[in-house]
Amino acid sequence: MEERNEQVVEEVKEEVKEAQVEEAVTSEDSEETVEEKSEAALLQEKVDELQAKLTETEGRMLRLQADFENYKRRVQMDKQAAEKYRAQSLVSDILPALDNFERAMQVEATDEQMKSLLQGMEMVYRQLLEAMTKEGVEAIEAVGKQFDPHEHQAVMQVEDSEFESNAVVEEFQKGYKLKDRVIRPSMVKVNQ
């Protein structure tokens, strides 16, 4: 019986040892689990932080990309406008010469020499007008048209029953447009 008691004691001791080992392993596991949980929380926090930075950076990149596209579009439009209106400065400088040609051609020729001179001036005038037309310059229609402050500059007002109200009665100086841009408005007399 003593043997049996010793055997039971031995078994109990072994069970206690196993329980202690199991308890030690469990406490180590729970310490590791706590450490793993806190490490997981730190990692999740880091992931969230990096995700926020990524979102912010993506947003900034998209805004920069949109700004760059807008910039390219503006540069292209400016380039097209510069090409379209490249002759504006030259045309503005030539307009006074055209006005002088028109005035000179209104003079009555008294002899053959004068007629020949006027004929030569008229040829030069037509060539200038042709060259300007090729560049997209056109005279602004004024007399009989409704007054348009974008195309006409009113220098006088009159009352004339032959014309509608606010119609251009007389043109003092021709106006010109380059494509769709007014270079010089027509100086006109307007009916009230």
From Swiss-Prot:
It comes from the Bacteria. One of its GO terms (molecular function) is protein homodimerization activity. Its main location: cytoplasm. Residues 1-34 are annotated as: Disordered. It is found in: Cytoplasm. Keywords: Chaperone, Cytoplasm, Stress response. Homodimer. This is Protein GrpE.
